A protein has these predicted regions:
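Structural signature of tandem alpha-helical TPR/SEL1-like repeats
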Residues: 1-6, 28-41, 63-75, 98-109
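Amphipathic alpha-helical repeat scaffolds of TPR domains
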Residues: 15-24
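TPR alpha-solenoid repeat register
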Residues: 17, 52, 86, 120-123
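Canonical tetratricopeptide repeat
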Residues: 20, 55, 89, 123-126
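Register position in tetratricopeptide repeats
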Residues: 27-28, 62, 96, 126-133
Length: 134
């Protein structure tokens, strides 16, 4: 993380470093305000980057702002289409936003697109848990 901070210090317009640090904090659920600010800065440089938009959506998810998370993550999925992690993020947000049917559809799509056994296992567990609720 220190190396990312240094990269940003040396080049404040390094959108990849801004997003990387912001997403890392979002994934950890820490420093969410600063994470959002870093990702917003990255998006000013590359406004249509689906991965950066996913990062912003994930910050909103971690903050518990599920409607905004869904809005950003739907946009991220439109821009990246095949990324199973972004699709899983959208499914997670749908579930928290009280839209379990949409969550299930997206979880199933993420399983089809994923090539990582750990991710597939995790998502299948989410599907099973959600199917029991519905």
């Amino acid at each position: 993380m220190a190396s990312m901070r240094k990269a940003i210090e040396l080049n404040p317009k390094n959108s990849a470093a801004l997003n990387y640090l912001g997403y890392t904090w979002a994934e950890m659920g820490v420093q969410l305000e600063e994470a959002e600010e870093l990702i917003q800065r990255a998006l000013k440089i590359q406004p249509n980057d689906g991965f950066y938009i996913d990062s912003l959506g994930w910050v909103y998810y971690q903050k518990g702002d599920y409607p905004r998370a869904v809005e950003q993550l739907e946009r991220a999925v439109e821009l990246t289409v095949d990324d199973p992690t972004i699709i899983e993020h959208l499914a997670d947000a749908y579930e928290k936003a009280g839209r379990p049917d949409r969550a299930l559809l997206r979880y199933r799509e993420a399983v089809k697109r994923s090539k990582e056994s750990d991710q597939i296992k995790r998502i299948r567990e989410k599907i099973q848990r959600l199917e029991k609720k519905i």
